[in-house]
Amino acid sequence: MVKALLVGSKVLIPNVDESRYIYSTGFYGKAIGISKPKGPKDIIRPLELSLIESVYLAKKGLIKVIDKNGEVLEYEKLYEYSSKIINKFDIMYRVYEDLREKGFIVRSGVKYGADFAVYTLGPGLEHAPYVVIAVDIDEEITPHELLSFGRVSHSTRKRLVLALVDRKSESVRYIMFKWVKM
């Protein structure tokens, strides 16, 4: 199991060989100081993981997260910690996990105004074809919000996907929008 260190809202894998291994299992994390690696061979620095990635990898048994006091944070404790740091973490994590389990590569979508950028092949191999916004199925979305989501995805030539999370059934449903010129 790979040793990872919790540092605020990030998790660091200091060992470069272990960083390369984790990256190779599904394009997880970002190598510090390397902007666009083409593959695992380009991972020559420690890897920085988001909390969502870290919770997922901890649940899978791929990483062991250690806090500043040297305590190992098991999946449940790391999930609880992340819920306090990230707004709507439970919704975001449910979507992240569902997409990963379906075989997609899921990265942060912040630069696209979304929760996630989703790849079928991986970053460095293609541009993300989808941007995903995670929403509680019971939450109302105004027409204005929907248009603003669409504007971002259209200007970046990505398909907008709303991921609707039903907390009761723990299911995720997806609605994809394709914008057309008329």
Swiss-Prot record:
Q: What is its EC number?
A: 4.6.1.16
Q: Which residues form the active site?
A: 119, 127, 158
Query: Catalytic activity annotated for this protein?
Result: pretRNA = a 3'-half-tRNA molecule with a 5'-OH end + a 5'-half-tRNA molecule with a 2',3'-cyclic phosphate end + an intron with a 2',3'-cyclic phosphate and a 5'-hydroxyl terminus
Any single GO molecular-function term of the entry would be:
tRNA-intron endonuclease activity
Q: Which domain of life is it from?
A: Archaea
Short name of one Pfam family for this protein?
A: tRNA_int_endo_N
Task: Give the record's GO CC terms.
Answer: cytoplasm
* InterPro entries noted in UniProt: tRNA_endonuc-like_dom_sf, tRNA_intron_Endo_cat-like_sf, tRNA_intron_Endonuc_cat-like, tRNA_intron_Endonuc_N, tRNA_intron_Endonuc_N_sf, tRNA_splic, tRNA_splic_arch_short
Q: Which GO terms are recorded in the biological process aspect for this UniProt protein? A: tRNA splicing, via endonucleolytic cleavage and ligation
> What keywords were assigned to this record?
Lyase, tRNA processing
The entry sums up its family as follows: Belongs to the tRNA-intron endonuclease family. Archaeal short subfamily.
Instruction: Sum up the protein's function in the record's words.
Output: Endonuclease that removes tRNA introns. Cleaves pre-tRNA at the 5'- and 3'-splice sites to release the intron. The products are an intron and two tRNA half-molecules bearing 2',3' cyclic phosphate and 5'-OH termini. Recognizes a pseudosymmetric substrate in which 2 bulged loops of 3 bases are separated by a stem of 4 bp.
Q: How does it assemble?
A: Homotetramer; although the tetramer contains four active sites, only two participate in the cleavage. Therefore, it should be considered as a dimer of dimers.
Q: Which PANTHER family match?
A: TRNA-SPLICING ENDONUCLEASE SUBUNIT SEN2
Could you tell me what this protein is called?
tRNA-splicing endonuclease
Which organism encodes this protein? Saccharolobus islandicus (strain M.14.25 / Kamchatka #1)
Query: Which gene is this protein's source?
Result: endA
